[in-house]
Amino acid sequence: MYRLDVTNFRVWVSIGVSEQERYHKQPILVSVSLVFREEPKVCSTDEISDGICYAALVSLIEQTAANHPCALLERLAKVLLEKLEESLAQFVCKIDLRVSKERPPIPNLLSPVSFSISKEVP
């Protein structure tokens, strides 16, 4: 199995149930794990053009999150998963995604709240 993991990429997004909560962008952590259909060509060639560019991957995540304001983490995760699948289906057979709200507006909650979603890519 060949897998690429990008862990805890911070994205600033408009998210929240209330208008007040969405008014200021909030930090969201996105982690994604991509399982490849076969050995990526880059493993043999050592050429960046034969692999998935990390910068392009996180840029896709950032742009998608910025262009799709959501009330809830669950919806944001689904939107991101759909975009990743659309962009990477020819290369990957499975996508695991975790979206974490670093600072949920809940008193005494000291750690992020996360939602995870996983999909086998046909």
UniProtKB/Swiss-Prot annotation:
Class in the EC hierarchy, top level: lyase
Its Enzyme Commission number(s) read 4.1.2.25
Q: Which reaction does it catalyse?
A: 7,8-dihydroneopterin = 6-hydroxymethyl-7,8-dihydropterin + glycolaldehyde
Biological or metabolic pathway of the protein? Cofactor biosynthesis; tetrahydrofolate biosynthesis; 2-amino-4-hydroxy-6-hydroxymethyl-7,8-dihydropteridine diphosphate from 7,8-dihydroneopterin triphosphate: step 3/4
**What are the alphabetically sorted keywords of the record?**
Folate biosynthesis, Lyase
- What taxonomic classification does the UniProt entry list for its organism? Bacteria, Pseudomonadati, Chlamydiota, Chlamydiia, Chlamydiales
Query: Which SMART domains does this one have?
Result: FolB
Q: Which InterPro entries match?
A: Dihydroneopterin_aldolase, FolB_dom, GTP-CH-I_C/QueF
Q: Which family does it belong to?
A: Belongs to the DHNA family.
* Highest rank taxon of the organism: Bacteria
What protein am I looking at?
Answer: Probable dihydroneopterin aldolase
Task: Identify the NCBIfam families for this entry.
Answer: folB, folB_dom
For molecular function, the Gene Ontology terms on record are: dihydroneopterin aldolase activity
Q: Which GO terms describe its biological process?
A: folic acid biosynthetic process; tetrahydrofolate biosynthetic process
Q: Where does substrate bind?
A: E21, Y54, L73, E74
Q: What does this protein do?
A: Catalyzes the conversion of 7,8-dihydroneopterin to 6-hydroxymethyl-7,8-dihydropterin.
Q: Which residues form the active site?
A: K101
